[in-house]
Amino acid sequence: ITDSLVGSEMCIRDRNSWTGPQLDLQRKDLGMSRSILESWISLDIANEIFTYTGFNYDSLKEIALDKSFQAFEMKGLSLTSKINSDISYFSSHNLIGYKEGSSKPDEYLIFMAHWDHLGINDELVGDKVFNGAADNATGVAAVIELARKFDQVQTERSVIFTALTLEESGLLGSAYLAESPPFDLANVVAGFNFDRVLPTGKTKDMAVIGYGASELEDYLEEELQKQGRYINPDPNPEKGYFYRSDHISFAKKGVPVLYSDDGFDLVEGGIEEGFNEIYDYTNFRYHGVNDCLLYTSDAADEE
């Protein structure tokens, strides 16, 4: 159900991800575990459906918060639909780098970033290319730089660096890696995700998306305090950002993960200017042609 419950403005901007081919993994059960039809509906329509079947949406939402809640069939509803689909198959790739640890080589840290974006939209007038400079060339650059730095030191645990495919198509690359890892997933002690490192400038804080998800935040807070900085929990948890990036594929398997994001409290400009910068990106660049090299390189030049 959309609207404010999952951030209606994000749903509108994400429509670029809904056009064209819709991708999925080639599953062993040939998709039989999936619903016949999956869709989103507005809150207004949801209320109408619940009322029509004799239920109250708000009341059931409260009841569903109890862990003993059981799903049930809403009788008296039917849907007639005709969908014509052409199915084709192709391969894409996750890239994995590996540095073996010294004393605990069978334990792993994993640093991840998705390398894909949205491609080209020939229906647009003018610029048609979705460059994805911030989302997520910056994240890939961060993982590459971390790999370069880790290559200069010896670590007790092994370190995995991965650039993941098809994040924008439903976190498919990370889902595949989490389901079929070339390493023992139970021995991954920490996973770090870099998804969109905005060039907003130096900050006094660091945002943690999904605050409270793992004890890795405690280690981050300890290091930030050494720099005179602090953790700023996600100010918009209702948007569900924690569930919309690659780390969640590993979190669902029990891997402790940390998804940190740009801080809001800018050294020059404070929190107000920080939120202005994020508003500019989210509303005028995110999943659009303006998320381009000029945006990221201009900020880098200022540094």
What are these regions (language model features)?
Residues I1-G7, Y295, A299-E303:
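Single conserved hydrophobic/aromatic residue that forms the stacking wall/gate
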Residues M10-C11:
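Active-site loops and adjacent core secondary-structure elements that bind or stabilize anionic groups
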Residues R15-K28:
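Acidic, Ser/Thr-rich peripheral helices and adjacent loops at domain boundaries
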Residues Q26-Y57, K104, T155, L164-G269, ...:
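Metal-dependent peptidase/peptidase-like ectodomains
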Residues K28-G132, R148, E156:
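Soluble metallo-hydrolase cores and metallopeptidase-like ectodomains found primarily
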Residues R34-L37, I83-D86, V125-N136, K204-G210, ...:
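Second-shell loop/turn segments in exported
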Residues H117-E123, T200-K202, G270:
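Short acidic/His/Gly/Ser-rich catalytic and metal-binding motifs that mark active-site loops
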Residues G132-L146:
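Active-site alpha-helical elements of protease catalytic centers
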